[in-house]
């Protein structure tokens, strides 16, 4: 057998040359105590605030309390498999989630892991969940409408792209239904509209029943709206840290569209439950409680989240992220801690009332208490032309209706005002899952403010509206097209619309 020393030595030298000299260094700590989703860890001296750490078995956690002798870690998952003395590793990464168009049509948890059984998500980009909101210079004032398809909102409390509009009300008043209709209303733009106007939707479910989230996803899927939506779900059975993180994760996914010159709409449903889970974490981390036992920084929790919704200027791509946070009140009490906080952070609120809901006024929007601080700059000119008068008339109607309860002998002008107000209130009702295009809303409200409903019985208003819309879609499509393209009611269009209304009103019985 021929042994070649030179060859063997060459192989050995090659092996030695490639031998790794660096030992793998990872900073580790030990679990001192664990319980209620919180672990106290000794060691990890150089850990960053908000850094992801790893427990045995691949369970992740986030370092929130950095104290002199230990680190308070919240656990993203079950703490049953973690025990005292376990080794905890630093990952060196701040909590981040996958972002990008690959997530559209998917249901994910607060860490961006798919939970819909449709296989892995092949997203190439990741983004930190908690980033700084854009400053003042990169922003632009809100000036484009974000149409929800609901007459009561688009006419009276308009929402613009880049705005934060709070949806607030007691349980079972239709808060989620408003978000759902706003999502469904984007379908027409996605199917035929220009690329620059498409609005991608993100729905964050915090602390909801799984059946409720499944129902929401089912409706989106059945109506063809899931393909441009992302669902982030941290349900009631998920640990508090996941419920706390979900809105930030959803926001990071929405920011991808905002920062790439596209438009996104995000609904947080709801931030009351996020505040409750944050309170739970803070108390277990032994942070001092404040009002209603919430920690002192619960205002900052919501403000840093909602400030990330913005309209960017043209240099930054002119994208936008619109936020519709939801807050659940107890017994219509908007003066509680969390409702007042979020009202002061947002650019207006849509106030829903149980009484209106049970009277059959749905969406149950209290027009008197609801405001949009962006106002008519988020409306097209055509909507401003018809909505200006409806606001005034409804305000007068509410005032008069209060007095009319006491006196029976009313003069003709007051009676006329009450009649008109009752019909306009009826006109603003809208069944669920039937959002209207802006030009259709304009035509319907035009009929209302120009007296076409005054002679009808209140019960026939809905029937009149349905008939009018069918008539305009078939006979008067040119009028609707003109309103859509001109974005205003010109004198010519006004004449045609009046003629169409006259001919329809004659035939309507």
UniProtKB/Swiss-Prot annotation:
Keywords of the record: ATP synthesis, ATP-binding, Cell inner membrane, Cell membrane, CF(1), Hydrogen ion transport, Ion transport, Membrane, Nucleotide-binding, Translocase, Transport
Taxonomic source organism: Rhizobium etli (strain CIAT 652)
Predominant location category: membrane
Residues forming coiled coils: none
The protein's role, per its UniProt record: Produces ATP from ADP in the presence of a proton gradient across the membrane. The alpha chain is a regulatory subunit.
HAMAP family, per the entry: ATP_synth_alpha_bact
One term under GO cellular component: proton-transporting ATP synthase complex
Binding of ATP, residues: 169-176
Record-annotated site: Required for activity: 370
Family: Belongs to the ATPase alpha/beta chains family.
GO molecular function, one term: ATP binding
Name of the protein described by the UniProt record: ATP synthase subunit alpha
Catalysed conversion reaction: ATP + H2O + 4 H(+)(in) = ADP + phosphate + 5 H(+)(out)
Subcellular localization, as worded in the UniProt entry: Cell inner membrane
NCBIfam families, per the entry: atpA (TIGR00962), PRK13343.1 (NF009884)
Top EC class, one word: translocase
Membrane topology reported for the UniProt record: Peripheral membrane protein
Complexes and interactors: F-type ATPases have 2 components, CF(1) - the catalytic core - and CF(0) - the membrane proton channel. CF(1) has five subunits: alpha(3), beta(3), gamma(1), delta(1), epsilon(1). CF(0) has three main subunits: a(1), b(2) and c(9-12). The alpha and beta chains form an alternating ring which encloses part of the gamma chain. CF(1) is attached to CF(0) by a central stalk formed by the gamma and epsilon chains, while a peripheral stalk is formed by the delta and b chains.
Assigned EC number: 7.1.2.2
InterPro entries given in the database record: ATP_synth_asu-like_sf, ATP_synth_asu_C, ATP_synth_asu_C_sf, ATP_synth_F1_a_nt-bd_dom, ATP_synth_F1_asu, ATPase_a/bsu_AS, ATPase_F1/V1/A1_a/bsu_N, ATPase_F1/V1/A1_a/bsu_N_sf
